[in-house]
A protein has these predicted regions:
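Sec/Tat-exported extracytoplasmic proteins
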Residues: 42, 73, 85-89, 109, ...
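Short secondary-structure boundary motifs at beta->alpha junctions and helix caps
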Residues: 58-68, 130-177
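Hydrophobic alpha-helical membrane-association signature
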Residues: 77, 117-119, 160, 164
Length: 191
């Protein structure tokens, strides 16, 4: 019986957010892809909506008590990136993998009344069968929140993930054509 009393009741005003479909036009990519993997560090491997109060506690991560993500940030990023980047495997079924490392996914308060959604990630194009890195690029975005609360953070994070997915798609699209004499990324991803 005592074990049951340690569970707290779910607050009546508990909110679960996602970053939802955004109706973007896909970014066509000629580099053959067979998959998109999105990974995040352990502190981002939960549904907690995290924030940081820079003036008072710049090194402390906090989580909203009454608000959660519908899934882990890496899952939500994966869905958006997968919808935005339009790529197919090579005709032989081969293709590279896109690996996205989510390094930061947080609402940062610079004052009590102002905050931004901060997202940092690294995208790597991995060769078929070897996972050798063929190309890599870091991306970061800070989007001001319309309100300094969890709901405002969701709006900013949604816009930020969307922008980073488009940027990653454009980066992949810009990898073609190959520079002088080198195998193109399309060729290397088709082996």
């Amino acid at each position: 019986m005592n074990g049951c009393t340690s569970f707290s009741a779910i607050p009546e005003s508990f909110s679960i957010y996602d970053i939802g479909p955004q109706g973007n036009s896909p970014v066509p990519v000629s580099v053959p892809l067979v998959g998109i993997d999105v990974v995040a560090p352990s502190w981002l491997s939960s549904s907690a909506m995290q924030y940081r109060l820079v003036p008072q506690h710049p090194l402390e991560r906090r989580a909203y008590t009454n608000s959660r993500w519908a899934g882990m940030p890496s899952e939500m990023v994966r869905i958006v990136v997968g919808r935005v980047i339009e790529a197919q495997p090579a005709t032989n079924g081969s293709g590279c993998r896109l690996r996205v490392d989510v390094d930061e996914f947080i609402q940062r308060f610079d004052t009590v009344d102002t905050s931004v959604g901060l997202i940092e990630l690294r995208a790597s194009l991995l060769a078929p069968r070897t996972d050798a890195v063929l190309a890599t690029k870091a991306f970061a975005v800070e989007v001001p929140t319309p309100t300094a609360d969890a709901a405002g953070g969701v709006i900013a994070m949604r816009a930020g993930v969307n922008q980073l997915a488009i940027d990653a798609g454009r980066w992949l699209a810009a990898l073609e054509p190959a520079t002088s004499g080198a195998d193109s990324f399309r060729t290397r991803c088709s082996r």
